Amino acid sequence: MKKFDEINIIPFIDIMLVLLAIVLVTASFISQGKIQVNVPKASTTQPMKADDLAKLLTITENNEFFFNDQAITKEQLIAEVATWDKSQKVSLKVDGAVAFEKFVELTDILSANEIKNVAIITKKETAPAPSSTPGSPAQVPAVAP
C-alpha cells in the first residue's frame, strides 16, 4: 500500500473557489434591494455612494411606503422621521407610476421635520439610437416654408 507523504490541497482550493463564487453572486443580489420600483429616467443622474443609502424611503406603484426595504405606514413614517437629525441624508426611490400627490406627501413629511439633505434615485437616461441604418438615406429635419 502506498503511503501519502503530502496533503493534496487541490480539492480544498476547488471548494474555496466555488464558495467564493457563491458569495460574490449573493452579494450582488443583496446590494440591488428587494423592492421592485420602476424609477423615472433623468439625463443628469449621478452615481451614489454606499453611505448615501443610510435612510432609503420608497414608494411602490401600489402607493405603499417602505423604509429601508421594510413596509411602513404613513403614521409610522411620520413618527420615524421625527426622530432623525436635521442633517440626515435621505434617498427617495419613487416608482414612475406613483401619483405626484404621494411624492408630495413624502417630501412634506421631510420638510415638516426640516430634513433638507434629500436625493432622488433615478435611472440614467440613454441617448436615443440613430434611426438611420447603413445604406438608407439620412433623415433631414423638415423646414417650414
From Swiss-Prot:
Single annotated GO MF: transmembrane transporter activity
Membrane protein topology class: Single-pass type II membrane protein
Keywords: Cell inner membrane, Cell membrane, Membrane, Protein transport, Transmembrane, Transmembrane helix, Transport
Keyword presence, Membrane: yes
Bilayer-crossing regions: 10-30
Location of region: Disordered: 126-145
Keyword flag Nucleus: no
Biased composition regions of type Low complexity, renumbered to the chain: 127-138
GO biological process per UniProt: protein transport
Residue intervals on the Cytoplasmic side: 1-9
Stretches in topological domain Periplasmic: 31-145
Principal subcellular localisation of the protein: membrane
Cell compartment(s), UniProt: Cell inner membrane
Cellular-component GO terms for this entry: plasma membrane
Function text: Involved in the TonB-dependent energy-dependent transport of various receptor-bound substrates.
Subunit structure: The accessory proteins ExbB and ExbD seem to form a complex with TonB.
Family: Belongs to the ExbD/TolR family.
Name this polypeptide is given: Biopolymer transport protein ExbD
Species this protein is from: Mannheimia haemolytica (Pasteurella haemolytica)
